């Protein structure tokens, strides 16, 4: 499998804000991640993040997050630093 890099917007609902889901997908699927921007409050978390890894593993990681209740949207524009 070839490697891919995906830019994503992740929205975590209140019940998942304190869960280590990014760590979990990194370990479980061998994903390298780069958090480009984050805003976390007591009630919601938003991450602009890059996932890099084998294509099938990145897709599995995205599916895992969605099943846990994270809203996952692909980013089609550059992230302003």
Model-predicted segments: where are they?
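Long, contiguous binding/interaction regions
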Residues: 1-46, 50-81
């Amino acid at each position: 499998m070839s490697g891919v890099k995906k830019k994503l917007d992740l929205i975590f609902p209140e019940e998942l804000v304190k869960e280590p889901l990014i760590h979990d997908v990194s370990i479980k699927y061998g994903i390298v991640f780069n958090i480009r921007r984050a805003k976390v409050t007591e009630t919601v978390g938003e991450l602009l993040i890059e996932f890099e890894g084998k294509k099938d593993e990145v897709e599995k990681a995205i599916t895992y997050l969605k099943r846990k209740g994270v809203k996952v949207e692909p980013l089609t524009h550059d992230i302003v630093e």
